[in-house]
């Protein structure tokens, strides 16, 4: 690599680190529709049997309440992927849905519909890798999500049935309700072994996970 290219890559990396730190320090995104506390009877369940898992069998459980359209979630996605690579065999990473933006419910439906065919993670990655194609649009982006399902080679009849199944919507709404009852008001919000995390840096996240694994 040339010196100029090396310098450019170093500057880009540094800028990304600064952005992630700033997002963690600033707190999460409450979205266009803020999730207020749920005062209905009952308490929130942090992880349900049908909660999507990106890894299993770990000694610690890391839970993220996320919104696929949330700018902070999108910016922190590479960091979460790095944590998964670093700790994936020792930590169970769980996704909980907290849709707050215009197309985030439809995105969550696409992810859950893909999960019916064992492809949650593939759709999860696709959604986070392509926010510029569908995010922050005033019009529904269902056609885009169905296009992603085709690209992933899913059975489209099964995908459509799952996407439109009231039970799929119910799972997502249950996840959001759980989050509200647990005090989640924005995304991303993290929990580790049942305790809420309020990190201000990536190092804080790593230190918390390391402590949980000791």
Show the residue positions of the predicted features.
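C-terminal cap of thioredoxin/glutaredoxin-like
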Residues: 1-27, 150-214
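Extracytoplasmic thiol/disulfide redox context detector
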Residues: 1-100, 173-176, 211-214
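Stable alpha-helical elements in mature extracytoplasmic
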Residues: 58, 76-79, 106-110, 119-123, ...
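Loop/turn elements at helix/coil->beta-strand transitions in domains of secreted/extracellular proteins
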Residues: 59-61, 88-92, 118-122, 154-156, ...
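Solvent-exposed loop/turn segments at secondary-structure junctions
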Residues: 68-71, 98-103, 129-134, 165-168, ...
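Sec/Tat-exported extracytoplasmic proteins
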Residues: 69, 84-87, 115-118, 127, ...
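Structural microenvironment flanking redox-active thiols in thiol-disulfide oxidoreductases
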Residues: 86-149
């Amino acid at each position: 690599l040339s010196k100029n290219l090396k310098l450019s890559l170093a500057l880009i990396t540094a800028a990304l680190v600064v952005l992630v730190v700033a997002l963690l320090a600033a707190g999460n995104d409450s979205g266009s529709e803020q999730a207020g506390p749920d005062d209905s009877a009952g308490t929130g369940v942090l992880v349900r049997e049908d909660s999507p898992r990106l890894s299993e069998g770990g000694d610690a459980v890391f839970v993220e309440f996320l919104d696929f359209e949330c700018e902070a979630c999108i910016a922190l996605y590479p960091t979460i992927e790095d944590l998964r690579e670093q700790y994936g065999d020792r930590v169970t990473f769980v996704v909980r849905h907290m849709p707050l933006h215009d197309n985030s419910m439809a995105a969550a439906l696409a992810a859950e519909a893909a999960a019916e065919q064992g492809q949650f993670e593939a759709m999860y990655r696709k959604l986070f890798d392509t926010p510029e194609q569908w995010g922050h649009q005033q019009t529904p982006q269902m056609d885009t999500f169905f296009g992603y399902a085709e690209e992933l080679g899913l059975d489209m009849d099964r995908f459509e049935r799952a996407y439109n199944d009231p039970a799929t919507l119910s799972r997502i709404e249950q996840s959001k309700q759980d989050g509200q009852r647990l005090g989640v008001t924005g995304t991303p919000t993290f929990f580790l072994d049942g305790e809420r995390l309020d990190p201000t840096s990536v190092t804080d996240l790593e230190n918390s996970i390391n402590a949980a694994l000791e």
